[in-house]
Amino acid sequence: MGLFSIFKRKKEEPEAAVIPTNGVTALAEGILFEEEGVFLKWGTDIEADKLYAKKEYRADRTIYQWGEKTILSGLKLSFKTVCWNHKQHGDTKALESVEFLSEESDALDQFQAIRDHLETVLGSSRQNEDMEPGEIALEWRIKAVKVGLNLYNKERPKVKFEIGWWV
């Protein structure tokens, strides 16, 4: 130890990343992709680690395709994140939500399977009363995070499942 070593700046060691093991309890802080063991905190820069499978540019938004991922104790779906250009702060594309959207002919079956899984894992939902006949909107809250599951019947059935802290 030299005479002037007390003036040297100590090197800060980076904190070890703690990956939660339970995706349900982790929802308050971020999303856990269970098979890969990847945990993404809400609000972090999506571009930082480039863990997405595909990126699509549109005029007013950027869509990050995550691919088929398992979340919430076994729910396996193909997820994406939409970053609207007018809502982002600066050049950072922040992770605010992940969503699954399907307009396939089996949308009603998909809705029922997702609903059954969510009710098993998260408990009973709060149902939105302001929907058109034949449409369903279910919602769960985990602290500041909203889990939403919707079934729309316009021209054909459409299911939308979304988890996020700005939803």
Predicted regions and their residues:
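Short Gly/Pro-enriched loop/turn and capping motifs at secondary-structure junctions
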Residues: S105, V145-K146
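Active-site beta-strand termini and strand-to-loop segments that position acidic
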Residues: E139-A144
